[in-house]
């Protein structure tokens, strides 16, 4: 699963001056680096337009996108195989492409890209739930087609339990709602189009209406009968609160909406409220929405405390101290750090190099709960946990790499910093002439697409040699041919009751009835939305005029 956005949008949360976001990255064509001549710039602009036109005219379906496509469009995938009438919300999906088009518009001032971004907005508006959020995917063929997909392909993805049932509501999971909301806000601010105002307001209301009085947010909203037990739990997993707070900060600073500021202040309260007593002073992936007790979720997310969630929440608590100057937000940070220190594995205990902290920690005993599975598909298979570190599942990390020392250093630094200086830089203060970052897709973006390394790090301004390579590698049709290393089994019908022969305990996919994506050793060449985003992000930096 995913945690989206860092760098400049993370800086937004830290209260960095707005001037950080308005500075431009000069292109090498202006600075004279490498082979930055005017002809290469013109060629690069042509490459960008050809690639964008192909995606807009040949690949998009009603303005939206999935993650990858067979070259002949015979198959296509989001996190799972998709119907031709579907678009995908999780990054790097529809809204990510919308951000890219808007980034290209900022870099080139070419109206083509603004109109392409508006096409994406139309797709998102059509896919928007009446409550204001988005599901993982949307099928323009209608509810019957959507339900058929969930009852076949979705239900058959053994390790993707979130797709086993369709509830007809929206989700905060995997940042799909957050990214779509941020994109609509960015695009609205460009020209204040009346077409976007009401969908944007619905997106804002979705975040506000779904927030509990205690400040937390559920994974899914609105509540529906029959949904999985964990759907209403307060969710820290996949940075749900972090993403919502970021969006609300953007709304507050750009639209002056005081509702957003009130919701941010309320959201901060759920973090200290759910921190567990010492000596286990951590957090769970999710907590009960009424009792605030730690809770489990998917069958490979057992009732436990989670070390990576704890590290993330420690960082958030320190953010809140920076924003408010209220020491109550950091007074129990040392307890949480001490708990993590006690969980660090000795070198001879490490199972995965570089990962020294077990993911799931049992309440009271402090023992690591390790997840396993048996069977061969979603029908015959099951997940279970025990304390045995041998043969764990591999699709969900059972150990984490955490930089606890860096958290402690930050705490010590903040504890001695002048409170007035912190408050002066707080993002909770209204800022005159505030502007969002010019570019979004050049930031770090973590995604679930197995085909992609897009967003693995901040995109750097490319060399002239790299620009020429990208220009020349765009094929005659207008896309960058990409090995589709992720694939999936086509839906093969209901699985038999008995498990198939074979050992699937540590694989990404089970038998032929399992529709979960996996990495193939014989990839076909196709069209990758992530590759399009990554390559275009590099090229737009090379031609950016800084205006």
Where are these regions (language model features)?
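Extended, well-ordered alpha-helical scaffold segments
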Residues: 40-55, 109-125, 192-208, 256-272, ...
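N-terminal secretory signal peptides
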Residues: 1-22
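Well-ordered alpha-helical scaffold segments within catalytic/enzyme domains
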Residues: 32-41, 95-111, 179-194, 243-257, ...
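A compositional/structural signature marking long, glycine- and acidic/polar-rich segments
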Residues: 230, 265-328, 333-341, 345
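Low-complexity, Ser/Thr/Pro/Gly-enriched N-terminal "stalk/linker" regions
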Residues: 29-92, 119, 123, 127-160, ...
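Active-site/pore-lining binding-face segments in mid-to-C-terminal subdomains
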Residues: 318-431
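Extended ligand-binding groove/face enriched in aromatic
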Residues: 59-102, 108-246, 261, 275-304, ...
